């Protein structure tokens, strides 16, 4: 069975969206294989997670945001879970996310000099899922 990794980001936890996100995962028929609440995430872990972005001019605010508060991380499984979860999340940029997606319903567009608060992360490929699961668990 295919697996993917997800994060409910600090904005999702702070805004009380954990239950809503987990409900959508379960309603879709996916199995929650692992779930862990992290009250604090280190900069080192975030740097490893976003290794392809480290060094980019836009990266420091992402690191700051991802270490700003608690997160919920997990592994879900099911048929075509990577593709389906990414569809359920919606577009990265809130203004492009369709209604009915997690980001379309709950994400906040960034103002000038603000970081996008898009509630969730999901692995973008089978390779990324394996790497991220090994990194976080």
Swiss-Prot record:
Catalytically driven reaction(s): a 2'-deoxyribonucleoside 5'-diphosphate + ATP = a 2'-deoxyribonucleoside 5'-triphosphate + ADP; a ribonucleoside 5'-diphosphate + ATP = a ribonucleoside 5'-triphosphate + ADP
Main location: cytoplasm
BP-aspect Gene Ontology terms: CTP biosynthetic process; GTP biosynthetic process; purine nucleotide metabolic process; pyrimidine nucleotide metabolic process; UTP biosynthetic process
Gene3D superfamilies in alphabetical order: Nucleoside diphosphate kinase-like domain
Residues that bind ATP: 9, 58, 86, 92, 103, 113
Gene Ontology molecular function terms on file: ATP binding; metal ion binding; nucleoside diphosphate kinase activity
EC code: 2.7.4.6
Coiled coil residues, start to end: none
Family note: Belongs to the NDK family.
UniProt function note: Major role in the synthesis of nucleoside triphosphates other than ATP. The ATP gamma phosphate is transferred to the NDP beta phosphate via a ping-pong mechanism, using a phosphorylated active-site intermediate.
Protein name: Nucleoside diphosphate kinase
Natural source organism: Streptococcus pneumoniae (strain ATCC BAA-255 / R6)
């Amino acid at each position: 069975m295919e697996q993917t990794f997800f994060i409910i980001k600090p904005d999702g936890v702070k805004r009380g969206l954990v239950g809503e996100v987990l409900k959508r995962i379960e309603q879709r028929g996916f199995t929650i294989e692992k779930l862990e609440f992290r009250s604090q995430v280190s900069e080192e872990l975030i740097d490893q997670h976003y290794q392809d972005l480290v060094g980019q001019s836009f990266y420091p605010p992402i690191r700051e945001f991802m270490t700003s508060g608690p997160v919920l991380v997990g592994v879900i499984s099911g048929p075509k879970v990577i593709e389906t979860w990414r569809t359920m999340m919606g577009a990265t940029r809130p203004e492009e996310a369709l209604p009915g997606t997690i980001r379309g319903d709950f994400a906040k567009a960034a103002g000038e000099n603000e970081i996008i608060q898009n509630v969730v992360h999901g692995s973008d490929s089978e390779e990324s899922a394996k790497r991220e699961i090994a990194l976080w668990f």
